[in-house]
Amino acid sequence: MTGDDSIFGELWRNTLDKILALFREQQRKNGTKTSYKFQRKTHVLHDTYSNYGYGHPSKSCGMIASAFRPSDDSQIFPYLIPANFFAESVLRKAAVILEKVNKDAGKAKECLALAHEIHKGLMENATVVHPKYGRVYAFEVDGFGSYLLMDDANAPSLLALPYLCPELVSVNDEVYQNTRRMIWSEDNPYFFTGTYEGTKIGAIGSPHTGLDKVWPMSIIMKGLTSNDVNEQRECVDLLVKTDAGTGFMHESFNPSNPADFTRSWFAWTNGLFGELVIKAYGK
């Protein structure tokens, strides 16, 4: 940590203003139709957005609506729960910077007010009672009561919540642990399994790569959100075993044939893998 706060100057302030304006608009307090819509001709369903580009109808609840997941796939419901937790966390951190570095209590208050609205929306809409796992976090909701139970490997994800915003969701939180058990099982429609060299492999995938591939990022996040060093090291060992001899982490791979992978070198996952190695062995 350098303690260098010189980056929080005019560019930072202007950028934050634009982000706040966008967040406010996408709370959709005046209805589903905002200035943003996205529609294009494509042979891939998740590359465009329904309802002439406006997406599934939403009911204003304080959360921020979005059209696409971190995977770049279009959402089914407009309120992506992991992204809203992350937004709340970042807004609270931005408020600290504004107050301590920029000496702007007014803008800090604005960030905190928006964070509070998101938090209220999450508390009222983010959880449902699963018949097998108890109370869990939904992946997406619409504010009307509809919800989607799944997780995608890309972060922000439900699995990654304690990694991205530990001040909001603890690893030991009961709802998170219930959710973790659900999404790291075949009760998550995007959890896939296979067997490679006698080892059964199961991990979370993504609609982005179809129905037969798991993502190293999900295995990494499993390790990064674990307090068990043995589990962390098991994740490292599995990732090393399934790199297809390339020495790199990939976007996704077939759990029964790691040589069948996408992206020969995926910087995002390679960086996270290094962090997991430090967490598992650096101590």
Model region roles, listed by residue range:
Residues 6, 31, 130, 231-232, ...:
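Secondary-structure boundary/capping signal
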Residues 15, 187, 194, 218, ...:
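Enriched - but not universal
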Residues 148-170, 174, 210-283:
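C-terminal capping/lid segments that line or modulate ligand- or cofactor-binding pockets
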Residues 93-96:
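Intrinsically disordered, low-complexity activation-like regions
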Residues 8, 76, 80, 262-266:
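Alpha-helix N-cap/helix-initiation motif
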Residues 2-17, 98-113, 165-180, 224-237, ...:
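Structural helix-adjacent loops and short alpha-helical linkers that scaffold large soluble proteins
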Residues 20-88, 100-101, 108-215:
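Extended ligand-binding clefts on enzyme/binding-domain cores
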Residues 1-48, 266-282:
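Aromatic-rich carbohydrate-recognition surfaces in CAZymes
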